[in-house]
């Protein structure tokens, strides 16, 4: 079978590396390519995918929201999240899914359930994670403004960072979904880590660098920290299961990404 990831830009994507590690571990002859789709050609996407005989694909920036208007059938989770990151094609019908929220939830499963969770940011990743966690936990969003959260089709409490003191003190889990801390962005922790209780867990959906400023500060306080690597692997594994009905080899996928990142650090 043939799979791909589409985006603009796309050359930075580690998805082909990760998925080919899975194919090798499972001894399949599946293929996975990174396809750059220029915005001016996006309206030809169905023709492009058909021409390349692709069976399923992932979507990254900037097309996750736009895909809602392209697919034939949208999964209920993708509808609520308002974005699609996985498309499965069967008998010419395009089915749209979102595995981001479930991918993240799987990475922190042992910590969740009846917890006070504070999510930093109100973008697409935040919405996916909020939707996946809010039914079993008390979820609060902190963002520069709260307007975006008010438009979501499910109810979440939201505050600005200036209003965050009491919220942070009660947090069991803090999750950064913003690009702050990613390479090329201003180093910042967004919140006062010293206000967190000693049992708090701090997460970041970023996996390069492996410890963003917020994770570094939390680790220095002795708090448990989790970066975004497991989320990346889990969402990819879930995509593979949607496409094929088979379980992915997540250990092989994760190790391939770790090896690549370690080599990159040494260069």
Curated annotation (Swiss-Prot):
InterPro entries tied to this protein: Aminoacid_DH-like_N_sf, NAD(P)-bd_dom_sf, SDH_C, Shikimate_DH, Shikimate_DH-bd_N, Shikimate_DH_fam, Shikm_DH/Glu-tRNA_Rdtase
Positions of the catalytic residues: 64 (proton acceptor)
Positions contributing to shikimate binding: 13-15, 60, 85, 100, 207
Q: In which pathway does it act?
A: Metabolic intermediate biosynthesis; chorismate biosynthesis; chorismate from D-erythrose 4-phosphate and phosphoenolpyruvate: step 4/7
BP GO annotations? amino acid biosynthetic process; aromatic amino acid family biosynthetic process; chorismate biosynthetic process; shikimate metabolic process
This protein's GO CC annotations: cytosol
Which residues make up the binding site for NADP(+)? Answer: 121-125, 205, 228
Q: Which keywords are on file for this protein?
A: Amino-acid biosynthesis, Aromatic amino acid biosynthesis, NADP, Oxidoreductase
Catalytic reaction equation(s)? shikimate + NADP(+) = 3-dehydroshikimate + NADPH + H(+)
Which EC numbers characterise this protein's activity in its record? 1.1.1.25
What PANTHER family does this protein's entry cite?
BIFUNCTIONAL 3-DEHYDROQUINATE DEHYDRATASE_SHIKIMATE DEHYDROGENASE, CHLOROPLASTIC, SHIKIMATE DEHYDROGENASE
The record's listing under HAMAP family reads: Shikimate_DH_AroE
- State the family it belongs to: Belongs to the shikimate dehydrogenase family.
Q: What does this protein do?
A: Involved in the biosynthesis of the chorismate, which leads to the biosynthesis of aromatic amino acids. Catalyzes the reversible NADPH linked reduction of 3-dehydroshikimate (DHSA) to yield shikimate (SA).
> How does this chain assemble?
Homodimer.
Q: What is this protein called?
A: Shikimate dehydrogenase (NADP(+))
User: What organism is recorded for this protein?
Assistant: Macrococcus caseolyticus (strain JCSC5402) (Macrococcoides caseolyticum)
């Amino acid at each position: 079978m043939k799979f791909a990831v589409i985006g603009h830009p796309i050359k930075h994507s580690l998805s082909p590396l990760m998925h080919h590690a899975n194919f090798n571990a499972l001894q399949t002859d599946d293929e996975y390519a990174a396809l750059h789709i220029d915005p001016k050609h996006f309206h030809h996407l169905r023709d492009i995918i058909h021409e390349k005989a692709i069976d399923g694909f992932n979507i990254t920036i900037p097309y996750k929201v736009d895909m809602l208007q392209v697919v034939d059938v949208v999964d209920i989770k993708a509808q609520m999240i308002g974005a699609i990151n996985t498309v499965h094609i069967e008998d010419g019908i395009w089915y749209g899914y979102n595995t981001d929220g479930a991918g993240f939830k799987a990475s922190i499963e042992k910590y969740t359930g009846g917890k006070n969770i504070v999510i930093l940011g109100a973008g697409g990743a935040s919405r996916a994670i909020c939707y996946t966690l809010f039914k079993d936990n008390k979820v609060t969003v902190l963002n520069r403004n709260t307007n975006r959260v008010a438009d979501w089709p499910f109810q979440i409490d939201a505050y600005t960072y200036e209003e965050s003191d009491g919220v942070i003190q009660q947090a069991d889990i803090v999750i950064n979904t913003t690009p702050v801390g990613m390479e090329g962005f201003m180093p910042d922790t967004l919140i006062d880590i010293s206000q967190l209780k000693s049992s708090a867990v701090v997460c970041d959906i970023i996996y390069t660098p492996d410890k963003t400023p917020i994770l570094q500060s939390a680790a220095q306080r002795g708090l448990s920290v989790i970066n975004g690597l497991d989320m990346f692997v889990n969402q990819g594994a879930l995509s593979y299961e949607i496409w094929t009905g088979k379980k992915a080899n997540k250990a092989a996928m994760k190790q391939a990404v770790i090896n690549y990142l370690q080599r990159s650090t040494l260069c």
